[in-house]
């Protein structure tokens, strides 16, 4: 199926970052920024399914994660191709119109879902050397039956592993001194990125450990600035998905 130009034109990222440097295998550090852009693209295409606010992000994060972050923890079942429309004899004109409208809506939702997946898949294929995904490629159909989510899972499972050493480096990055002449949002991002990395590595921060990192930043500032920053920085984030 060809990629709908209307879908691609709505993406905030016309292309995504490369999932790895030239000649080097992907890592979590190189995969995460690219997949984050892919998530944003998926979420930008409206959908009435699920909770109706997250677009088609289910295509990149999967069903379980979608239900976790959706309003009301609702699921997003993938649309199925509707069967040919059959109109029983004796059906009223009004009911025929309703049946046709419902069938058209179901067909449009199915086609849109697959068009978005095709567009996202093309982006990740363009951003990744085939060497690292060749095990998913069929000799006859290529990647035609491979979904965007399957590509993402393959890359993370095979190349995005987080080690004890990289977790140690991550905490050091979280504790890098903040330049107080820059916006405080940069400090928030620094700590949030570290928390997300630790969670992805299977070592989410306990409350105690979180506060240790938090006060590492606010206590050296002292004075009124420290008092000002403390309630801002030391707010434990929501769980990451």
Give the role of each language-model region.
Residues 137-139, 227-230:
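Short coil/turn segments at secondary-structure boundaries
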Residues 129-133:
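Short connector loops/turns at beta-strand edges and beta->alpha or beta->beta junctions
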Residues 136-143, 170-171:
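"Short basic amphipathic alpha-helical interaction patches in structured regions
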Residues 152-159, 170-177, 233-241:
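Fungal eukaryote-biased detector of long internal structured cores
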Residues 1-22:
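Plant-biased recognition of short, low-complexity, intrinsically disordered N-terminal tails
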Residues 124:
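Terminal peptide-recognition signature
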Residues 64-66:
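Long, low-complexity intrinsically disordered regions in eukaryotic proteins
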Residues 20-50, 69-81, 87-105, 113-116, ...:
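Amphipathic alpha-helical oligomerization segments
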């Amino acid at each position: 199926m060809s990629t709908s130009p209307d879908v691609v034109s709505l993406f905030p990222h016309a292309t995504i970052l490369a999932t790895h440097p030239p000649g080097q295998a992907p890592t979590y550090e190189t995969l995460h920024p690219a997949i984050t852009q892919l998530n944003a693209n998926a979420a930008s295409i409206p959908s009435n399914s699920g909770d109706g606010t997250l677009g088609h992000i289910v295509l990149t994060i999967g069903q379980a994660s979608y239900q976790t972050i959706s309003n009301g923890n609702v699921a997003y079942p993938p649309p199925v191709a509707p069967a040919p429309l059959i109109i029983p004899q004796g059906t009223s004109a009004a009911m025929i119109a309703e049946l046709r409208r419902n069938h058209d809506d179901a067909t449009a939702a199915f086609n849109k879902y697959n068009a978005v997946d095709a567009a996202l898949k093309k982006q990740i294929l363009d951003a990744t050397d085939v060497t690292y995904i060749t095990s998913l490629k069929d000799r006859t159909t290529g990647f035609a039956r491979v979904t965007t989510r399957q590509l993402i899972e393959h890359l993370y499972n095979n190349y995005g592993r987080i080690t004890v050493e990289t977790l140690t480096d991550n905490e050091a990055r979280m504790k890098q001194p903040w330049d107080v002449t820059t916006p405080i949002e940069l400090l928030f991002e620094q700590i949030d990125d570290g928390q997300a990395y630790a969670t992805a590595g299977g070592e989410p921060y306990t409350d105690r450990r979180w506060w240790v990192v938090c006060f590492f930043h606010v206590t050296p500032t002292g004075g009124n600035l420290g008092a000002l920053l403390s309630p801002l920085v030391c707010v434990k984030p929501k769980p990451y998905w």
